[in-house]
């Protein structure tokens, strides 16, 4: 069966790493890479890999959507331009996976709520943030056992792995992640902190998650839930590792993670970017599988 064809908007670190992951997919075919700088290294690399490219932004892509049968588009640009991109793409029937903090569509954290989004046929889903993808599964692992009054995460990332787009979006990062800790993670109140570490050599992404439960924590149930969720995330992020915990102190549950990347395009220390691209690829593959199943059902009914 033919692969589902995709476009990538934004040829920076995230867009380029995502391209490498999509090229390995059994169900997705990356066809277009869209940028705004003719001299972009990401566009040049995409051309070398056989993709069609444009430096005219989304205006350069739209006329080709139908002819090239683009069904899914990934937006790895900026929260400030995503609204326009999404409106123009979804109006043409293209499903959008948003890797910016814009959060126009509902938050998607694959092991927590991806199945629900596929069932509701959402046209735009938001991948939260790198910190959100790394930590929200842990908040949810606690909240699915018992109510969580407060969830706080600290994402520590290497300065080298944080590009200009992420730096411009720091405020959006913290707001979006905190909102998703509540909406997806299940905490009644959420807080997110990002620490950009300039250490050399660069450090692998580290995440700390603190949850305050309403009642005394069920140690055995929460520990089992956390380990089950670690295994789920490792299916698509093999470098997702529990370094310590869960640690229990009164009503506080603390979990300590490390996220190492696959090293597709980005260095392995850039696990913060790798978990975003891996989560987006996982989401798109599940959406594409649902598209295929729907097409097969239509053919059977014809």
From Swiss-Prot:
Keywords: Aromatic hydrocarbons catabolism, NAD, Oxidoreductase
GO molecular-function terms, A-Z: acetaldehyde dehydrogenase (acetylating) activity; NAD binding
Key word Nucleotide-binding present: no
Gene3D superfamilies: Dihydrodipicolinate Reductase, domain 2 (3.30.360.10), NAD(P)-binding Rossmann-like Domain (3.40.50.720)
Residues given in the record as NAD(+) binding sites: 161-169, 272
CDD domains: ALDH_C (cd23933)
Reaction equations catalysed: acetaldehyde + NAD(+) + CoA = acetyl-CoA + NADH + H(+)
Its EC number(s): 1.2.1.10
Catalytic residue list: 130
Protein name (record): Acetaldehyde dehydrogenase 2
Species annotation: Cupriavidus necator (strain ATCC 17699 / DSM 428 / KCTC 22496 / NCIMB 10442 / H16 / Stanier 337)
